[in-house]
Amino acid sequence: MSDVILDLQLACDEARGLPAEADFLRWLQGVLPLFRDCAEVTVRLVDEAESHELNMTYRGKDRPTNVLSFPFEAPPEVELPLLGDLVICHQVVEREAQQQEKALEAHWAHMVVHGSLHLLGYDHIQDEEALEMESLETEIMQKLGYPDPYLAEKEA
């Protein structure tokens, strides 16, 4: 098994109801070993204010979002296991899970899987890329024991 190193940062006022560090590690271990032998990821849990500010600064979107991914780009000659940072807004994740009628734990897992794939270079801007990324997300989520996160969209 490959090494996954997690730096979990709690930067939100309310810690009650958040997944445990072991959950985040398990979700990362469901993704990263498929692509790398060793990876280090920071997961920062934030409130809506920080998510909103980061989303505005880096994406020009004037609202908080569920997950932001910040890949680490080392010079080509430097080999480091640092993959990057995931910033996850717990209020947005909780609200989305409720609105989409998804189990909260499954939605948290999906945000970690989705964000990790962004760190690995996957994107969903073009339709073809989106289909590839969603297919990978579904496969990884099912291996982790969760339902297809896009099932409701596919059935609509």
From Swiss-Prot:
Compartment(s) where it occurs, according to its Swiss-Prot or TrEMBL record: Cytoplasm
* Cofactor requirements of the protein: Zn(2+)
**UniProtKB keywords:** Cytoplasm, Endonuclease, Hydrolase, Metal-binding, Nuclease, Ribosome biogenesis, rRNA processing, Zinc
Chief subcellular location equals cytoplasm
The EC code for this enzyme is 3.1.-.-
One Pfam family cited in the UniProt record for this chain: YbeY
Q: Which InterPro entries match?
A: MetalPrtase_cat_dom_sf_prd, YbeY, YbeY_CS
Residues annotated for Zn(2+) binding in this entry: 114, 118, 124
Top EC class for this record: hydrolase
Q: Which biological processes are named by the entry's GO terms? A: rRNA processing
Recorded GO terms, molecular function?
A: metalloendopeptidase activity; RNA endonuclease activity; zinc ion binding
What GO cellular component entries does it have?
cytoplasm
Parts forming coiled coils: none
Cofactor binding note of this UniProt entry: Binds 1 zinc ion.
Checking PANTHER family in the record gives: ENDORIBONUCLEASE YBEY, CHLOROPLASTIC
Purpose of the protein: Single strand-specific metallo-endoribonuclease involved in late-stage 70S ribosome quality control and in maturation of the 3' terminus of the 16S rRNA.
Query: What family classification does the UniProt entry report for this protein?
Result: Belongs to the endoribonuclease YbeY family.
- Protein name in the entry: Endoribonuclease YbeY
Q: Native species of this protein?
A: Sodalis glossinidius (strain morsitans)
